[in-house]
A protein has these predicted regions:
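Signature for the C-terminal beta-barrel architecture of outer-membrane proteins
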Residues: 23-56, 65-66, 71-72, 76-91, ...
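Phosphate/ribose-recognition catalytic cores of enzymes acting on nucleotide-derived substrates
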Residues: 97
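Surface-exposed extracellular loop regions of Gram-negative outer-membrane beta-barrel proteins
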Residues: 115-126, 131
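Bacterial Sec-dependent N-terminal signal peptides
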Residues: 1-30
Length: 244
């Protein structure tokens, strides 16, 4: 039943994209579908445990809409049953990712789910690695602002994805983060011709969580982390450093 849904959805995406794509004034719809199925057989040589369901299925369908500076999208996910090796917290079928965003020349706003990373990702990284079953997207609000050329600010607040049970379920912790990055070469026109390229950045991330306390430890409810970073490039030489 779920496989038939994905097949019908695929034809709908292709058909809609073809029609709307001919008239850009109405916007553009795009999408893709990925399905992964596994059939398990008993291996008497290595005595591997055989799951009761015998067949695993993971399915993903993305639908995105874009018109000018506005974008929106959803991702429908299905785990019936979850592939072996995937986290046991992935089960059922439903919406696992949805967002709307608006971007102009120097301002960008995203509401819903999004992925992002500060610097090397040591203090904040929200990303998806589907083959490993990793998805810790942030569900909240993100604002990007470029007050002047070469200087970018980014602030966000939200909850991270924790598990999937017939839909997205976030963790209880609230993430609050801000990041700034200064491109020296873009800041001053005279430095655009320098062979040395330099970028400075700084980040601060805090998390509020009331679930940390146990009978053995009384953990703080607010935990913060900060970092500064420097990226240098000279011809084929590159240097990246971050202090946390």
């Amino acid at each position: 039943m779920k496989i038939n849904f994905f097949i019908k959805l695929g034809f709908l995406i292709l058909f809609t994209s073809k029609i709307i794509g001919q008239n850009n004034s109405n916007g553009l719809v795009s999408g893709n579908i990925q399905t992964i199925g596994q059939y398990y057989q008993e291996d008497t040589i290595i005595n591997a445990a055989l799951p009761e369901h015998l067949y695993g299925f993971n399915g993903f369908a993305n639908i995105n809409y874009q018109k000018g500076d506005f974008r929106a999208g959803i991702r429908y996910e299905s785990y019936l049953n979850t592939l072996e090796g995937y986290p046991s917290t992935f089960s059922g079928t439903g919406i696992g990712y949805r967002y709307i965003s608006w971007n102009s020349d120097n301002v960008g706003v995203t509401v819903g789910n999004f992925y992002d990373q500060f610097g090397s990702g040591m203090i904040f990284r929200a990303y998806e690695e589907r083959q490993l079953g990793i998805d810790n997207s942030l569900d909240g609000i993100r604002i990007k602002y470029e007050p002047f050329k070469g200087f970018n600010l980014k602030g966000m607040i939200g909850k991270q994805r924790h598990r999937f049970e017939d839909g997205l379920i976030n963790g209880n912790g609230i993430v609050r983060a801000i990041d700034g990055e200064l491109n020296i070469n873009e800041l001053f026109d005279s430095t655009n011709y320098w062979k040395l390229k330099a970028t400075l950045g700084g980040s601060f991330v805090s998390k509020f969580n009331t679930d940390n306390n146990t009978t053995l430890f009384n953990m703080p409810k607010n935990v913060g982390a900060s970092s500064i970073r420097l990226n240098l490039r000279y011809k084929k030489l590159r240097f990246s450093g971050e202090y946390v």
